[in-house]
């Protein structure tokens, strides 16, 4: 059985949703580097930088990076529809997954941990970095929305890995509210992904409504 390290409200939600869609049995270990968690020491043993999601496969090999995990699951379980069967369409989906990971996902780190890029920032520097980082994040999402139209999903005829990752990472940094103003059709698509019956139960565990 696969083992997924993650915590509620984190990027591990995308991996969890993909595993559910693919019908792959897995167990979860609650672990996060930014808060006390029962599985943190175990996570550090398999992933020294303690990033989540981290997925341990049946053979003991370790997968990190959300895009890489989703690509693997899509290739290993083609019947799931996580990735397209057509090579050209699949190539664009992989491009989109890597775009989100390299640009939008990475940009969250500047908002949450500006001190990683600027040692001991004072309050003014911190706020300036976060403001510029947020503006850049929103710009990157706008570019993504323009480059990856829904037909009717980002993954094509079926909801897939690219939809899942976009709906996860867009929850942070005020991206959704910004997209509702600048790219309302794309924001509406994210809302459709949220309520899809294959995704909604996972989202309810990660982002429970008050």
Question: What are these regions, as identified by a protein language model?
Answer:
Residues 96, 100-195:
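GST-like fold's C-terminal all-alpha helical module
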Residues 200-210:
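Terminal-tail/helix-coil boundary detector
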Residues 22, 47, 77, 148, ...:
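A broad structural signal for alpha-helix termini and local helix breaks/kinks
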Residues 74, 169-170, 203:
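Active-site-flanking alpha-helical
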Residues 68, 185, 198:
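Residue-level recognition of oxygen-bearing side chains
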Residues 14, 39-42, 185, 189, ...:
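Hydrophobic alpha-helical segments typical of transmembrane helices
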Residues 1-127:
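GST-like domain detector, emphasizing the conserved glutathione-binding G-site
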Residues 53-56, 154, 200:
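Short beta-strand(s) of the beta-wing in winged-helix/HTH DNA-binding folds
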């Amino acid at each position: 059985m696969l083992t997924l390290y993650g915590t509620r409200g984190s990027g591990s939600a995308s991996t969890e949703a993909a595993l559910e869609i693919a019908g792959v049995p897995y167990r979860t270990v609650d672990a996060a580097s930014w808060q006390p968690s029962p599985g943190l020491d175990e996570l550090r043993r398999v992933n020294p930088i303690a990033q989540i999601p981290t997925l341990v496969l049946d053979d003991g090999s370790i997968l990190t990076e959300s895009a890489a995990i989703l690509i693997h699951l899509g290739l290993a379980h083609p019947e799931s529809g996580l990735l397209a069967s057509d090579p050209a369409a699949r190539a664009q989906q992989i491009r989109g997954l890597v775009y989100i990971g390299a640009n939008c996902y990475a940009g969250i780190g500047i908002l949450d941990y500006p001190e990683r890029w600027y040692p001991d920032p004072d309050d003014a520097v911190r706020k300036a970095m976060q403001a510029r980082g947020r503006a850049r994040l929103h710009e990157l999402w706008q570019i993504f929305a323009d480059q990856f139209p829904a037909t009717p999903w980002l993954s094509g005829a079926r909801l897939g890995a690219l939809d899942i990752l976009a709906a996860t990472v867009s929850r942070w940094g005020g991206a959704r509210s910004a997209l509702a103003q600048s790219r309302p059709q794309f924001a509406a698509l994210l809302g459709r992904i949220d309520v899809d019956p294959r995704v909604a139960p996972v989202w309810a565990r990660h982002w429970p409504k008050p």
